[in-house]
A protein has these predicted regions:
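Hydrophobic membrane-insertion alpha-helices, especially the h-region
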Residues: 2-20
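Cleft-lining beta-strand/loop regions that shape enzyme active-site pockets
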Residues: 15-34, 38, 42, 46, ...
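Extended, small/polar residue-biased N-terminal targeting/export presequences
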Residues: 49-110, 156-188, 508-518, 524-536
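Structural motif
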Residues: 126-128
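Short, surface-exposed secondary-structure boundary micro-motifs
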Residues: 134-135, 398
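Polar, glycine-rich mid-to-C-terminal structural blocks
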Residues: 293, 305, 312, 316-383
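Conserved functional hotspot residues or short segments at active or partner-binding sites
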Residues: 346-347, 351-548
């Protein structure tokens, strides 16, 4: 029973303390009365139920059900899942320093982080992990969650990893001393052309802002005059990271966003004018996977007329969560406020309390309605607002880009879709990488590796591989999808052998969104233009109107 009582106490202290510290004394208290039926019920079950019951397990199941009656983003995270849920945003975690995939119930090391613990111990990309701390680790017990549990651990602790190396059947054992492994938010930064710097950001974590400054300094050394920030498929993260980023590009006293909730008075976030890149022409890329903090940044740039937004309509998450930890290290993320862009719009898409079904299907619904392929399919149901120079923007459903670029469907046949959805493309790419690693290790640059792969007839090799695994060969569809298949296969092998930066550089070469970005910069159109004033009616025109 101590854990049950702890829940009541901790909710009162932690949530109450947070609100008293951050929201001007508006304190949230847990209602503690004789009608606290949930607490009484748990006591009754523990004291009188016919069989012994794990009360902690009941609580783990009850809390998500309670939160499910709220908005779709108020969630419970169990203690065993908490570390994985926060590692990406923390900036680092303690582990061995490998990227891996699980194939045929075995861990395959995909990449070894440079200068990380695993590399220092002697592990190589391509190694198959078959034992951890002297115990076999193969078969059905091998899952992502279990692998993380065994390989992660406190800094400076040791773990023995048994591997089978390519070309050998002998198990070699390496002792790895765990260390801090950085988790990067900025996954690519390079020059698209002689004038245009490009930065891809995958989320907004503790280190996103300093990582971006390092990337900008690198691009400055290369003489960039334009900047493209790619937030496509960026699911968000910490609000403060987005605010700090936006501040770098805005003049003084510009509103970045404000937050407001039932128990939290309005809080404005203003720029201080100390950023170093306030005048550089800029484009921000978004799509339906851009959410939360990514939308905060894009909305601040759009509403302040600071950058041109290119891509497709963003996800539409305009709610702010506070993370609260329980004594057992489980978490809840509770929605405490909404955020509003500088024009006053909340871009949260509609939802129904306690019913997340339609909400979770929203992106599929957009796809089926043709929104990914035609700007005319975007239906604005929220109110209209105006940017600083008078451009119309809309609330209630994500950020609509200034320039729409449809999803590229060239080569998207039923054969390609099945190959992709079945996982066969990823499986083939990894198998090819593993089988040809000695040769592929000779290529250290993306272009060199891409040129080599172009000569290997990978599409034909894939068709044979897929046919043996149940995807029937369809030559006409394969020909129609040849270029797309070749590009995707190349990109996955490049990712396996090099890194995410190399993968990004490769796919951007043939990306219509990147082409549109460069067109905007070449036309000196990155700074939004003030809308033309409506033409004044002539006397003749006014007479015609009256006759109607």
């Amino acid at each position: 029973m101590p854990f049950i009582m702890a829940i009541c106490v901790v909710l009162g202290i932690i949530i109450g303390t947070f609100f008293s510290n951050h929201f001007a004394g508006n304190r949230l208290n847990v209602i503690n009365s004789g009608s606290n039926r949930l607490n009484n019920l748990l006591h009754l079950i523990d004291d009188q139920y016919v069989d012994a019951v794990n009360i902690d397990s009941l609580v783990d199941k009850a809390i998500p059900q309670i939160l499910a009656e709220l908005d779709p983003h108020s969630v419970y995270i169990s203690a065993k899942d908490a570390a994985a849920a926060t590692d990406d945003l923390k900036g680092s975690f303690s582990g061995v320093g490998i990227e891996f995939v699980i194939r045929q119930d075995t861990i395959h090391v995909q990449n070894v982080i440079q200068n990380g613990p695993a590399e220092k111990a002697g592990l190589l990309a391509g190694d198959k992990i078959v034992a951890v701390d002297g115990k076999p680790f193969v078969g059905k017990i091998v899952t992502n969650q279990e692998a993380m549990h065994r390989l992660k651990g406190p800094k400076d602790t040791k773990v023995k990893i048994g591997v089978i190396r390519y070309g050998s059947k002998k198990v070699q054992t390496f002792t790895v001393t765990r260390g801090e492994i950085p988790t990067k938010s900025v996954t690519a930064a390079y020059m698209l052309d002689d004038n245009t710097g490009y930065i891809r950001i995958k989320n907004f974590g503790e280190n996103t802002y300093p990582e971006m400054l390092i990337a900008l300094a690198k691009l400055s050394q290369q003489g960039f005059k334009n900047l493209c920030i790619d937030l496509r498929d960026n699911s968000g993260g910490y609000l403060t990271a987005a605010v700090n980023m936006a501040n770098e590009f805005l003049p003084e006293k510009k509103l970045i966003l404000y937050t407001q909730g039932r128990k939290s008075p309005r809080q404005d976030y203003m720029s201080d004018g100390k950023g170093s890149y306030k005048k550089i022409p800029m484009v921000v890329l978004i799509n339906e996977g851009s959410a939360s903090s990514a939308e905060i940044f894009a909305g601040a740039m759009q509403d302040n007329d600071r950058a041109t937004i290119i891509g497709r309509r963003s996800f539409g998450k305009g709610l702010v969560q506070q993370q609260i930890e329980f004594p057992d290290h489980s978490l809840i993320r509770l929605t405490i406020a909404r955020y509003y862009t500088p024009s006053g719009r909340c871009i949260q898409k509609p939802y129904t309390l306690g019913d997340s079904g339609d909400y979770e299907q929203d992106l599929l619904t957009r796809y089926e309605h043709g929104e990914f392929f035609s700007q005319d399919s975007i239906k604005h149901t929220g109110p209209a607002y105006h940017t600083g120079i008078g451009r119309v923007v809309y609330g209630g459903g994500g950020i609509t880009p200034d320039i729409f670029v449809p999803e590229d469907t060239l080569g998207m046949t039923s054969y390609f879709k099945e190959a992709s959805m079945s996982g066969l493309i990823l499986q083939f790419a990894f198998t090819y990488t593993d089988d040809n690693r000695p040769k592929l290790n000779n290529f250290k640059e993306m272009m060199e590796l891409a040129d080599y792969l172009d000569k290997q007839n990978l599409v034909e090799q894939f068709a044979v591989y897929a046919d043996k695994r149940g995807l029937k060969r369809r030559n006409l569809l394969i020909r129609k999808s040849h270029k797309l298949l070749d590009r995707v296969l190349d990109s996955r092998i490049i990712y396996n052998m090099l890194d995410e930066q190399a993968w990004t550089e490769y796919i951007n070469q043939d990306d219509p969104v990147i082409r549109k970005t460069l067109e905007v910069f070449n036309n000196h159109a990155a700074f939004p233009k003030k809308p033309a004033a409506p033409a004044k009616a002539t006397k003749t025109a006014s007479k015609v109107v009256k006759k109607k």
